[in-house]
Swiss-Prot record:
Keywords: Cell membrane, Membrane, Transmembrane, Transmembrane helix. The chain crosses the membrane at residues 4-24, 52-72, 85-105, 115-135. Disulfide bonds: none annotated. It is a multi-pass membrane protein. This is UPF0756 membrane protein PEPE_1090. It comes from Pediococcus pentosaceus (strain ATCC 25745 / CCUG 21536 / LMG 10740 / 183-1w). Belongs to the UPF0756 family. Its main location: membrane. Pfam families: DUF441. It is found in: Cell membrane.
Length: 152
């Protein structure tokens, strides 16, 4: 019962914040809870969902290349400016933080609740995008390591 109330609460907050992605996500999860074999579906989504999401984002990023909006010369030209180098460095940093984040979430599932709450607050009340839980966990991991805080 608690999970239903929690999900409905997230749905209401998403509605109030007019966040379409979170509205759809909460409706889908609530709907899946109604399906008799959701106990088989949720572990699969929990394990593979992020990979599927990253794949969809990767496909979206590659579409401009497929349509010809971005060509090889655009890639070459991106290395001719400080902005391009900064973008490449940030891409590398985010991928490394995300890698640490996935491991951190697996090793410390209790952190997931806090990250989800932070993501919801950022998405609903600050017009953020819910692409950040993995990166957020990577940043949290980095800060925890820098501060030498022991993880349970």
């Amino acid at each position: 019962m608690e999970s239903w109330l929690f999900l409905i609460g997230i749905f209401i907050v998403a509605l109030l914040g007019k966040n379409q992605s979170l509205i759809i996500a909460s409706i889908v999860v609530l709907f899946l809870k109604l399906i008799p074999y959701s106990d088989k579906i949720f572990p699969l989504l929990n394990k593979q969902g992020i990979n599927w999401g990253v794949t969809i984002i990767s496909i979206t990023i590659l579409v401009p290349i497929a349509t010809g909006k971005i060509g090889f010369m655009d890639l070459v030209n991106s290395f001719k400016s400080p902005v391009g180098w900064i973008a490449v460095a940030c891409g590398i940093l985010v991928s490394l933080l995300s890698y640490q984040g996935v491991g951190f979430l697996s090793a410390s599932p209790e952190v997931t609740v806090a990250l989800v709450m932070g993501t919801i607050i950022g998405v609903v009340f600050m017009n953020g995008i819910a692409a950040g839980p993995i990166i957020a966990s990577g940043i949290a991991y980095l800060i925890i390591q820098l501060l030498q805080i022991q993880i349970k």
